[in-house]
């Protein structure tokens, strides 16, 4: 498919008139084709069964497309754009898939990802197009942002920032969005850049799918260029790679989803003022990547989720429609290929140079009149300094700006002539230096690659003082100055090693350089001895090199210089040291404070100054972190003034510094002063420690007197309250440690107990695994188990099932002799069976899972009650018939001469006295309490008379008593009969309840014995089988019933626990 054809964005005077170039690309992997996610036809791209126009994308890379095809399609033009002075961004968006990772980072064999190819071609283009008047430096940074917790991680901080400063995304109304405290590491070779890239990529490739969705990696390659000549110009261009995830699957977790990320990208492409989720870290990262970009390429890829692929396709279509509207709104038609140029005031375009780079060819670059910067368009990343200058003369031609075409956009410049003399220009000498070798570097930074041994591209320049003291300028280097200086390498005029590039003054004789530091041999030896032997206080810093037992003094010294510098807040941490010097004439010292260029400086009239000097204009394009330079320089100036006042009082230091013939740069002076200050603090600490050791212990009551005497004598006062507080803190710490020790012991005991429990469980599991028969029996039994409390038929009902019984179900029948005999016999049988361990023949089946009841209730079924009632009625009827027959056969013939076939004669009974008698239906009832022997007709009384004849009933009602005697029975024995009946009912109820409870207890024991045997506890099963209830003998019926109910509850709980355990084991098996 043809490349994206839109006219190149012209670099005009106003950045608002510049339209960023936008390309849309997509990749189709072999997995997408195999699973039917994407299919490409002649006119459509089918994604998840839906057709999309092929014109939506500028490039569609099939499965057979190589990395070189992708490079030639869009990456080469982006590198050309960077060399032309623009920022460029590649935004790769898609789910975690092998195709996406291979396109961006390459595989483990070829390692030909897009980022690797961009680094290689960029470094090769810099090496092949060197210019003696141009310095180019490449810096690399890698940031990862997680939208889950809004955290920002600097992936290269272990190589650049031992203090691990917090990286922030700052949204400034004037400068835009920028990264603060990010680690920008200078890379000089391809191997170094690939090493840092691999370190950053490792964090991305090891992420799981969910973490990949919610995290985004931002890798940038920044080109800092400086052009030397009559005027100095510089700037920064940036090539960014933004590897974005696709967000959360849903918004329930509070994270940003794919539509939310798409709305942010659309707002950035449309250049809307309102951007959704403006304060989120993800939105700020996207703004940081796209706000200054003049050339943006979207690279979409697809994953395994259908909805994610549809969202990506919809986003691509929206961006394509937005691009068409923006191009048509500005009156430009997509045509031509990418080029870069400028337009003059007449409308004619004048090309200032392009670079064509191919993966296999050599870049061809035409020289440009002036360097342009993509950061210059945003007017946010260039800081202009006016530093210490030297008196020089310039030519009249240099007082005015040389005539340049309107297409060239120079940076801010200021030319001031305070002396009124026509200056004569003198060219600057730009010397470069090679990086020194530090043997102590490995102790501070632990992740140095093998290729960087002996090289310190990222260390702070604070150690230059020590290096220069160890190697004085006249003896540190014997090699001559290189005739053809190389960018960021070589030797300086002072013949010593240094970091980076130095913009030096005109050549100074070597003899004057010897007195640079104004230190005699004694002071130098003292400083060297202190730096070799001193140890930094632990409260100032905590360095990882001490944790790894760094024994070298060089390692300790370098860690002290980096991490515990007293003035580190006013010294900028950079890899190269920008050193400036001033030349003096006539032995007079010129004092020129550092300041930042402002509008007030531009408006000052050159004739208002009385000083005979001309300041040298140094313009340097700095990174965004240099925006703090205003505060830094203000602090530096204040401390320099304070130091000059102290030098006036101190004669030794003031004399040694006033006799110098050459000014020392402010940076070196304050480095030296910081070391002396640290040395003084160390000495004070040692003196105080010695005094504390030599001080004798005194009584507590004399502390105040001694303190006053010490104040009066002018000696050092010891703060005893602080010492007491320190002791209290130590005591509290010891108590806390003791409490922790007790907790540790408890935790150890708990661990031992836990191990024993696990060992027992393992033994049980092992036994169950060895005995397959037990497992099979448990499985067969569990087939009848039920988790519900009411499962099964009428014959299998749970104990906890609450049933509403009929009101007469628990009422006893009329107590007769036959009933008493039956009850006595049943009790005797049950006691005998309970003692022998045997039970009734019909026991309930073990076929249901029994839950723990809330309260115990006797299980009485309706069928059982009905059968027992019928059985009682049949028994009472049979007993009545038998007794009636016996009485009829054994009745006295004297008493009954004849009998009616329709009535039954009842024997009279005496009650209430000898003269009262009655007969009725209650007198013939067998087992009655009122039954008496029959009186014969021949029996006589004591006086020889016959007893009064008892009235006998021969009526058809069979035993109705006469009305004359009934009232006597009702009034005399009614209360006694009711009380006796209640006692009998209570006794019978207790007997029945005890019988049923004992029967239930026997069932529970049988079931518990079987459950114990099923889980392998044979001893417990034997104990349960041999247990008896002889211990309850001798107790009252009520106490015995309560005790048996409590035992039944315990047995139910044990049975439920055993069944649940067997079910758990069977489930695991």
Curated annotation (Swiss-Prot):
Region (Interaction with unc-73): 403-877
GO MF term set: ATP binding; microtubule binding; microtubule motor activity
Entry GO CC: microtubule; striated muscle thin filament
The protein's role, per its UniProt record: Required for posterior migration of cells and axon growth cones during nervous system assembly. In PLM neuron, regulates innexin unc-9 gap junction turnover by suppressing unc-9 transport out of the gap junctions.
Annotated region (Interaction with unc-51), positions in chain: 331-517, 517-719
Stretches with biased composition (Polar residues): 938-960
Name of encoding gene: vab-8
Post-translational modifications reported in the UniProt record: Phosphorylated by unc-51.
Description of how the protein assembles with itself and partners: Interacts with unc-51 and unc-73.
Biased composition (Low complexity): 339-364, 391-407, 824-847, 906-928
Biased composition (Basic and acidic residues): 883-897
Protein name: Kinesin-like protein vab-8
Predominant location category: cytoplasm
Family that this chain belongs to: Belongs to the TRAFAC class myosin-kinesin ATPase superfamily. Kinesin family. KIF26 subfamily.
Domain called Kinesin motor: residue spans: 15-325
This protein's record includes keyword Phosphoprotein: yes
InterPro entries: Kinesin-like_fam, Kinesin_motor_dom, Kinesin_motor_dom_sf, P-loop_NTPase
């Amino acid at each position: 498919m043809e490349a994206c054809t839109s006219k190149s964005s012209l670099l005009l005077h106003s950045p608002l008139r510049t339209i960023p170039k936008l390309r849309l690309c997509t990749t189709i992997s072999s997995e997408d084709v195999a699973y039917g996610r994407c299919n490409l036809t002649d006119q459509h791209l089918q994604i998840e069964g839906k057709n999309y126009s092929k014109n939506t994308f500028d490039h569609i890379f099939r499965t057979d497309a190589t990395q070189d095809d992708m490079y030639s399609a869009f990456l080469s033009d982006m590198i050309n754009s960077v060399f032309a002075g623009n920022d460029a961004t590649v935004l790769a968006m898609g789910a975690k898939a092998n195709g996406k990772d291979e396109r961006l980072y390459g595989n483990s064999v070829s390692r030909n990802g897009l980022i690797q190819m961009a680094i290689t071609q960029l470094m090769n283009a810099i090496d092949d197009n060197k210019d003696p008047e141009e310095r180019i430096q490449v810096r690399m940074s890698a940031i990862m942002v997680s939208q889950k917790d809004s955290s920002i991680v600097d992936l290269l901080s272990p190589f650049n920032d031992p203090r691990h400063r917090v990286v922030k995304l700052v949204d400034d109304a004037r400068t835009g969005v920028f990264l603060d405290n990010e680690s920008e590491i200078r890379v000089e070779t391809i191997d170094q850049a690939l090493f840092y890239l691999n370190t950053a990529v490792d964090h991305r490739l090891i992420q799981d799918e969910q973490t990949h969705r919610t995290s985004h990696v931002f890798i940038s390659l920044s080109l800092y260029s400086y052009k030397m000549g009559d005027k100095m110009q510089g700037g920064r261009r940036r090539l960014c790679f933004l590897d974005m995830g696709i967000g959360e699957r849903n918004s329930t977790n509070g994270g940003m989803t794919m539509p939310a990320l798409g709305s942010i990208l659309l707002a950035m492409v449309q250049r809307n003022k309102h951007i959704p989720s403006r304060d989120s870290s993800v939105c700020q990262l996207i703004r940081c990547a796209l706000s200054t970009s003049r050339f943006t390429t979207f690279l979409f890829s697809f994953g395994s989720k259908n909805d994610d692929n549809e969202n990506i396709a919809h986003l691509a279509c929206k961006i394509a429609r937005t691009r068409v509207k923006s191009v048509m709104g500005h009156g430009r038609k997509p045509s031509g290929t990418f080029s870069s140029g400028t337009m003059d005031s007449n409308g004619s375009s004048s090309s200032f140079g392009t670079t064509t780079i191919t993966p296999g060819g050599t870049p061809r670059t035409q020289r440009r009149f002036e360097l342009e910067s993509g950061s210059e368009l945003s007017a946010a990343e260039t800081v202009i300094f006016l530093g210490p200058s030297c008196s020089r003369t310039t030519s009249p031609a240099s007082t005015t700006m040389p005539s340049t075409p309107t297409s060239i956009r120079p940076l801010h410049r200021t030319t001031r002539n305070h002396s009124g003399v026509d200056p004569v220009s003198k060219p600057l000498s730009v010397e470069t230096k090679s990086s020194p070798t530090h043997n102590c570097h490995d102790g501070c930074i632990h992740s140095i690659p093998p290729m960087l041994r002996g090289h310190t591209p990222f260390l702070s320049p604070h150690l230059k003082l020590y290096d220069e003291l160890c190697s004085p300028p006249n003896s540190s280097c014997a090699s001559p100055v290189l005739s053809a200086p190389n960018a960021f390498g070589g030797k300086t005029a002072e013949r010593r090693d240094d970091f980076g590039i130095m913009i030096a003054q005109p050549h100074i004789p070597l003899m004057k350089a010897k007195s640079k530091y104004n230190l005699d041999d004694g002071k130098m030896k003292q400083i060297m001895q202190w730096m070799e032997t001193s140890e930094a206080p632990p409260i100032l810093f905590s360095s990882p090199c001490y944790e790894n037992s760094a024994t070298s003094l060089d390692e300790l010294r370098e860690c002290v210089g980096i991490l515990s510098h007293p003035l580190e807040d006013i010294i900028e941490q950079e890899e190269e040291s920008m050193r400036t010097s001033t030349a003096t004439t006539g032995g007079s010292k010129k004092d020129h404070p550092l300041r930042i260029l402002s509008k007030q400086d531009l408006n000052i009239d050159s004739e208002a100054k009385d000083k005979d000097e001309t300041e040298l204009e140094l313009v340097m394009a700095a990174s965004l972190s240099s925006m703090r330079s205003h505060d830094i320089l203000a602090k530096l100036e204040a401390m320099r003034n304070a130091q000059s006042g102290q030098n006036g009082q101190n004669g030794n230091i003031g004399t040694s510094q006033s006799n110098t013939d050459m000014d020392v740069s402010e940076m070196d002076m304050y480095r030296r002063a910081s070391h002396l200050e640290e040395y003084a603090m160390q000495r004070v600490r040692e003196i105080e420690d010695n005094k504390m050791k030599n001080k004798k212990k005194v009584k507590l009551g004399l502390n105040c007197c001694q303190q006053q005497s010490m104040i009066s004598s002018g000696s050092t006062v010891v703060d005893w309250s602080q010492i007491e507080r320190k002791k209290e803190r130590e005591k509290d710490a010891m108590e806390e440690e003791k409490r922790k020790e007790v907790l540790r012991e408890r935790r150890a005991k708990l661990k031992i107990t836990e191990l024993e429990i696990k060992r027992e469980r393992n033994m049980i599991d092992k036994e169950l695994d060895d005995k397959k028969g037990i497992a099979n029996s448990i499985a067969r039994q569990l087939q009848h188990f039920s988790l519900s409390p009411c499962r099964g038929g009428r014959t299998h009902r749970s104990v906890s099932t609450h049933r509403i019984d009929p009101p007469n179900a628990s009422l006893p029948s009329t107590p007769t002799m036959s009933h008493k005999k039956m009850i006595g016999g049943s009790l005797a049988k049950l006691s005998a069976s309970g003692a022998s361990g045997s039970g009734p023949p019909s026991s309930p089946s073990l076929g249901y899972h029994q839950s723990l009841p809330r309260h115990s209730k006797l299980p009485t079924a309706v069928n059982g009650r009905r059968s027992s009632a019928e059985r009682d009625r049949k028994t009472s009827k049979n007993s009545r018939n038998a007794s009636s027959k016996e009485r009829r056969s054994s009745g006295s013939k004297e008493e009954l001469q004849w009998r009616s076939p329709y009535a039954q004669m009842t024997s009279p009974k005496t009650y209430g006295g000898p003269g009262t008698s009655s007969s009725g239906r209650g007198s013939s009832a067998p087992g009655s309490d009122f039954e008496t022997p029959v009186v014969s007709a021949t029996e006589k009384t004591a006086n020889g008379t016959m007893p009064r004849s008892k009235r006998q009933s021969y009526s058809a009602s069979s035993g109705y008593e006469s009305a004359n005697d009934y009232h006597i029975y009702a009034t005399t024995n009614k209360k006694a009969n009711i009380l006796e009946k209640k006692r009998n009912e209570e006794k019978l109820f207790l007997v029945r309840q005890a019988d049923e409870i004992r029967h239930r207890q026997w069932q529970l024991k049988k079931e518990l014995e079987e459950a114990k045997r099923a889980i392998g506890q044979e001893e417990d099963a034997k104990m349960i089988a041999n247990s008896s209830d002889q211990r309850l003998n001798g107790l009252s019926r009520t106490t015995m019933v309560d005790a048996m109910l409590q035992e039944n509850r315990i047995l139910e709980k044990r049975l439920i626990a055993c069944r649940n355990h067997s079910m758990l084991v069977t489930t695991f098996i």
